[in-house]
Amino acid sequence: MISGLKGILRKLEVGFVHIETGGITYEVTISFKTYLELKNLPLLKEVQLQIFHSINERGQKLFGFLTEQDKEFFKVMKGLQGIGELTALKILSFFSAEDLYRIVQSGEVKELEKIPKVKGKTSEKIFFEVKQNLKKLELFLSGSSKESSVILTSLLQSPEEMAFSKKRETVILGLVQLGFEEKTASKEVDKVLKIFSSNDPGEIIREILKSL
């Protein structure tokens, strides 16, 4: 089983990264959050990822995370009934464990619909499963390390700046899921956010689509 990879960054796209180590190049599936944290690195830069090695009847797949905390959160999510690996990865793209705990405690099911293609019964299913297993999430939160590659950024940003950055990333991911190139999505989001104010990513996406 592969539990970690350290090697040369060969290719990076939304959804996956290629890492070369020991003369072998591995394709690793990543969340949009991890993509954003890696995208400013130059190719051939050495990177290290925590790996969850999935093996089932359909084959093998590597899922990569920048921190052990993210990897463990992924394992908690995919272990819930009806939430597979790809849905768990989508959850990580949009929400931290703290976010998810807050959503379930407050009953804000609609918050989960920020995830592309997660609507109605799907969001309700995720909400129900997390609520039924809230103790697992509490144990994860109480035992998880506070170390993270984004802590420094968080300390340097005001709450307003952090909220804006998260909203922007959510809208970009939504556009990417609709088929936009990440660079084009970023450009369109920045353009619309200068003239359109809303805290609802769905409204911002609709405004962008109207302006095209």
Curated annotation (Swiss-Prot):
Gene Ontology biological process: DNA recombination; DNA repair
Keywords: Cytoplasm, DNA damage, DNA recombination, DNA repair, DNA-binding
GO molecular function: ATP binding; four-way junction DNA binding; four-way junction helicase activity
InterPro entries: DNA_helicase_Holl-junc_RuvA_I, NA-bd_OB-fold, RuvA, RuvA_2-like, RuvA_C, RuvA_C_sf
Pfam families the UniProt entry points to: RuvA_N (PF01330)
The record's note on its domains: Has three domains with a flexible linker between the domains II and III and assumes an 'L' shape. Domain III is highly mobile and contacts RuvB.
Record's function text: The RuvA-RuvB-RuvC complex processes Holliday junction (HJ) DNA during genetic recombination and DNA repair, while the RuvA-RuvB complex plays an important role in the rescue of blocked DNA replication forks via replication fork reversal (RFR). RuvA specifically binds to HJ cruciform DNA, conferring on it an open structure. The RuvB hexamer acts as an ATP-dependent pump, pulling dsDNA into and through the RuvAB complex. HJ branch migration allows RuvC to scan DNA until it finds its consensus sequence, where it cleaves and resolves the cruciform DNA.
UniProt-recorded name of the protein: Holliday junction branch migration complex subunit RuvA
Naturally occurring in which organism (per UniProt): Leptospira interrogans serogroup Icterohaemorrhagiae serovar copenhageni (strain Fiocruz L1-130)
Lineage: Bacteria, Pseudomonadati, Spirochaetota, Spirochaetia, Leptospirales
